[in-house]
């Protein structure tokens, strides 16, 4: 069986008290790999990145499945599950099915959920013409980017209160999945075995 710990942290802008807060961009993740690999590490450190950025895929990934930096430091980008082979530039939320990602939850009387770029046209208007996404760069029929309600990725109802954000933050989604929220009671985690397979291979090194 695998024996490892995950570093749990929140984004810097998180309001959760007592949590470790880190701004973990792709660039910073790569820098951390280089830094930790420069000195011997007493235990294996594994850095895992989304697969939605070409330069990061090259820096942190490898055709063998993971990159060996030396001094017990390893990295890999998340492998692409079978249901995402047509759109391989993915982040961790894409491990879930589209239906699971789009599950609605009620927060303070507002129905919120994660949206995907292909639900909107290239100017940010939803297919049914009811909603608007302010992040046009994430929108379009060929895009599956996660639209999660952060300040620059708000979704609002065109005919309603434009101040009400309908998109669900990634961390709220993750907390509810982890907390066995009833809305996500039947969520499918099977794709995550791909990640644990790579961790297992690294642990066996």
Model regions: which residues?
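Conserved helicase/translocase motor-coupling segment
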Residues: 1-63
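Active-site-proximal structural scaffolding
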Residues: 38-40, 85, 89, 185-188, ...
